[in-house]
A protein has these predicted regions:
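Gly/Ser/Thr-rich phosphate-binding loop
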Residues: 1-25, 38, 48
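Active-site glycine-centered loops adjacent to acidic/histidine catalytic or metal-binding residues
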Residues: 7, 31, 88, 112
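Short beta-strand-to-turn element immediately C-terminal to the catalytic PLP-Schiff-base lysine
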Residues: 16-20, 42-43, 60, 152
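Conserved ATP/PPi-binding loop(s) of AMP-dependent carboxylate-activating enzymes
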Residues: 32-36, 47-78, 113-115
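Conserved beta-loop-beta connector loops within the AMP-binding
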Residues: 40-58, 94-95, 157-161
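AMP-binding/adenylate-forming catalytic core of the ANL superfamily
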Residues: 61, 66-67, 89-176
Length: 181
């Protein structure tokens, strides 16, 4: 058996839990809301998003902090209407399981599209020649930012930019790295 718990020091408890072997098909999930905990995912305006859409994960439950010590501004940004805004970007699947996507501040905005580097990093990590990868936002006059991928190739292997481009054809065009290093 295994279990995964998701929580923050500000929540002092498992906002989400993922227990038992019956959930093995939910690899990568942080789980479902823990006992007496609630979760929701919201957009930039604080509105709940549709299931399957990405937004900021908010948690509510026993053990939630009351404030940041001597920092009312940070408290007001993080705690709103009894909800803790975690700064974690997440999505909920059709079975109610939550998956972390990235940190809110790690978003690349390219031509008005939100791109989460960890999604592209996970995708590129599946390529058999890739040892490690980091995806970053690079300034672009027309689009604001473009994606760049810094790739470390496995020992004894060679990999061309063309190979990576071909592999990335499975990604939506706006998510494909425009610069490969």
């Amino acid at each position: 058996l295994y279990d995964t718990n998701y929580g923050l020091s500000e929540s002092t408890g498992p906002g989400c839990v993922h227990l038992g072997m019956e959930n093995i098909h939910k690899v990568g999930a942080i789980g479902v809301p823990g006992y007496r905990w609630e979760c929701k995912i919201v957009d930039e305006e604080g509105n709940t998003v549709k299931q399957g859409d990405v937004g900021e994960l908010c948690v509510k439950g026993p053990g939630l902090m009351t404030c940041y010590y001597n920092d009312p501004e940070a408290t007001a940004q993080t705690l709103r209407d009894g909800w803790l805004f975690t700064g974690d970007m997440a999505m909920q699947d059709e079975d109610g399981f939550y998956f972390l996507v990235d940190r809110k501040k790690d978003v690349i905005v390219s031509g008005g599209e939100n791109i989460y580097p960890v999604q592209i990093e996970n995708f590129l990590s599946a390529y058999d020649k890739v040892k490690d990868v980091a995806v970053i936002g690079l300034p672009d006059k027309r689009l604001g930012e473009i994606t760049g991928a810094i790739i470390s190739v496995k020992d004894g292997m060679e990999c061309t930019e063309e190979e990576i481009d071909a592999f990335c054809r499975e990604l939506p065009r706006y998510k494909r790295p425009k610069k490969i290093i």
